[in-house]
Amino acid sequence: MIHIVTCLSRTPDFIDRAYESIKALNINYQWYIVTTADKALSLNYSKYKNTTIIVKPGQMAMHTGVNYYYDVIPDQGQWVYVLDDDNLMHINFNLVEPHTYSPKCDMIVVGQQQETREIRYVDGIFNIAIQKIDNGQFLVRRKAVGPLRYWPIYRGDGYFASEIRILTYESGRDIAILPVVASYYNRQTWKE
């Protein structure tokens, strides 16, 4: 099972478009939308299948929503993929198939399409550049995260990915690098 985690910090129409991109996939998923109480009230989430709304107390800032997901949803053997609310899933996400990886694999690094149509990939486990990796470029086993959380800073996703890489490598676990485009980076804000 893949848990897709989206923190809603923008308008609900971003969630509608994100849902359409998820619904087009052929994967076993549960979608968690983490948001504040006021934004939760504006969502018509009855139309979203396999979706759980998590209301986070306080404000939504940087990566606090993802951290809140990790605080309230325990390890159930799931893979976690963070879909920023301005990103959209790519149909090739179907090719990732995390259930086919060895139980020793704790992280899968994937590609992401940018507005320029360029594909952003990571070219090695030691080349996870903090300033160049986005949430949409990796999946992680929930158990591998443990107490680790995102830092509430710009590029926090890069630091998080780097820390997961270090923990995984140092514990003798595996990281897979898959040349598959999993999402569109900031797709909902592209100029048409």
Q: PLM features: residue spans?
A:
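Conserved nucleotide-sugar donor-binding catalytic segment
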Residues: 126-192
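Glycine-rich, basic loop-to-helix element that forms the pyrophosphate-binding segment
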Residues: 56-73
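N-proximal low-complexity "stem/linker" segments adjacent to membrane-targeting elements
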Residues: 1-21
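Short beta-strand-to-loop acidic/aromatic patch adjacent to the donor-nucleotide binding site
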Residues: 77-88
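Conserved donor NDP-sugar-binding/catalytic core segment of glycosyltransferases
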Residues: 95-122
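Short, acidic, metal-binding catalytic loop of nucleotide-sugar glycosyltransferases
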Residues: 20-29
